[in-house]
Amino acid sequence: MKPPISIQASEFDSSDEEPADDEQTPIQISWLPLSRVNCSQFLGLCALPGCKFKDVRRNIQKDTEELKSSGIQDVFVFCTRGELSKYRVPNLLDLYQQYGIVTHHHPIPDGGTPDIGSCWEIMEELATCLKNNRKTLIHCYGGLGRSCLVAACLLLYLSDSISPQQAIDSLRDVRGSGAIQTIKQYNYLHEFRDKLAAYLSSRDSLSRSVSR
């Protein structure tokens, strides 16, 4: 019988180690002012807290504590559960709830768009949070594609006076030129109002026919 092989600690891949507290920068939250859509609140956007992927090595506990200390009361998560596992934060939604942060999970595929019914639900939930003066944060993986799309849709939802391009510009002012990442997302935003109006009209028609 061969003796067990002795493995030195230095032989292990150390890439999974948590970064030391002084190595990790605070999680960066961008605050989108909603004053131009007649709302005094700000909407927070950020990248995925606790993410461990490629050269990103964040500490999930530390990030969540920072969100809580920032006063975040509601968080909207657009990552799929598969993504949360891939980026090593499979229990993120549970952790938010443990910290007393109300969690709204609306998974949208990376680079994709929500169906209009789901988007309307997100708009209603966001509008309710903001109306009740709750400090609200939204995020996907990078905080640029899906999150910025939803935030831009919210601007169009809250005001008829803002154009799709103005909404995109507002997001790029706070998140940089990478906001709204795909042609699909760009087109979705430009068609959002018409599609939402058609969806709500058909929904009302169905409701009336059922109530007869």
Swiss-Prot record:
It comes from Rattus norvegicus (Rat). PANTHER family: TYROSINE SPECIFIC PROTEIN PHOSPHATASE AND DUAL SPECIFICITY PROTEIN PHOSPHATASE (PTHR23339). Keywords: Cell cycle, Cytoplasm, Hydrolase, Protein phosphatase. It is found in: Cytoplasm, Perinuclear region. Residues 13-24 have a biased composition (Acidic residues). The active site is at 140 (phosphocysteine intermediate). SMART domains: PTPc_motif. Residues 1-34 are annotated as: Interaction with CDK2. InterPro entries: CDK_inhib_3 (IPR008425), CDKN3 (IPR022778), Prot-tyrosine_phosphatase-like (IPR029021), PTP (IPR050561), Tyr_Pase_cat (IPR003595), Tyr_Pase_dom (IPR000387), TYR_PHOSPHATASE_DUAL_dom (IPR020422). Its EC number is 3.1.3.16, 3.1.3.48. Interacts with cyclin-dependent kinases such as CDK1, CDK2 and CDK3. Does not interact with CDK4. Interacts (via C-terminus) with phosphorylated CDK2 (via C-terminal helix). Interacts with MS4A3 (via C-terminus); the interaction enhances CDKN3 enzymatic activity. Residues 1-24 are annotated as: Disordered. The keyword Hydrolase applies. Belongs to the protein-tyrosine phosphatase family. The keyword Oxidoreductase does not apply. May play a role in cell cycle regulation. Dual specificity phosphatase active toward substrates containing either phosphotyrosine or phosphoserine residues. Dephosphorylates CDK2 at 'Thr-160' in a cyclin-dependent manner. Pfam families: CDKN3. GO terms for molecular function: protein serine/threonine phosphatase activity; protein tyrosine phosphatase activity. This is Cyclin-dependent kinase inhibitor 3. One of its GO terms (cellular component) is cytosol. It catalyses: O-phospho-L-tyrosyl-[protein] + H2O = L-tyrosyl-[protein] + phosphate; O-phospho-L-seryl-[protein] + H2O = L-seryl-[protein] + phosphate; O-phospho-L-threonyl-[protein] + H2O = L-threonyl-[protein] + phosphate. One of its GO terms (biological process) is regulation of cell cycle. Residues 32-201 form the Tyrosine-protein phosphatase domain.
